Amino acid sequence: MTGNLRECAEMKLKSAGINTDIFKRNGILFGGFGNDHIDRPKLVEKAIERAHLEIDEKLTPSDFIVIGDTPKDMHCGHVNNVPGVAVATGIFDLNGLKDCSDAVLEDFTDIEKTLATFRSVQYVSRSLDYDYDKNVTE
């Protein structure tokens, strides 16, 4: 899920050297994108909806993770009961992200730590008490 348009998301993935074919279904990039809805939490809903259509298994919100670098990214997951992993690669540091996320990483340079975090993260409803709009810029 990203606030970017589908086409921009694909360009960003390709520019990072990522083979986007692994994220495609029927030739179309799979997920939730900015051109799906203006309300960002609805993008998570859309990504989950698409996953349910593509995968024949019973999926729950805990089968997904929202990864982002702002409290508002975490909010998108939390309103959908999806755990959020915050990464301090943007304007928010570790301290600015720890209270609004279910897990926080400084960056993705330690692949083993990153994957272990993704595998173990659990949604914690306490984070819904966080004031996501306080001191947040888009």
Question: PLM ranges: what are they?
Answer:
Residues 10-138:
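Asp-based, Mg2+/Mn2+-dependent phosphohydrolase catalytic module
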Residues 2:
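Conserved phosphate-coupling serine/threonine residues in phosphotransfer and NTP-handling enzymes
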